[in-house]
Amino acid sequence: MHEKQVKSILSAQNGMNLYRGCTHGCIYCDARSTCYQMDHAFEDIEVKSNAAELLEKALKSKRKKCMIGTGAMSDPYLHLEKRLCLTRRSLELIDYYGFGLSIQTKSDLILRDLDLLKSINRKTKCVVSMTLTTYDEALCRIIEPNVCTTGRR
């Protein structure tokens, strides 16, 4: 893991990745592609340490409310999220400023933030997507070795 100060956190389409890289080890992962020009090993997670400040600034300056998307390139609930809480802080900001959320994950750690997800959904809209690759627990551990099994999801 290494930290990096970034210049922006939201894409033009309101996508947000708080982390860059992944430790899930999914054999089918597209985010490993060299077309994304990562300058470090994919498993060496880049933590966007100034993400919360940038997100708050971006949300304050938006003229229209919209859905903020996260989880497309890096799971927002990687194992280190338990300690860093960048996703939780971002959800607090999204909730506070009244934006919607679309979040993708393979982790049951999302349950930690159920209070915020419910609050966002009451005010606007919150869509949670979870990958369910296979219900075969043994196969799941082979194709997604470092994440909770489909049964836990």
Model-derived regions, located:
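Conserved Radical SAM active-site core
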Residues: 1-129, 135-138
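Glycine-rich S-adenosyl-L-methionine
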Residues: 146-153
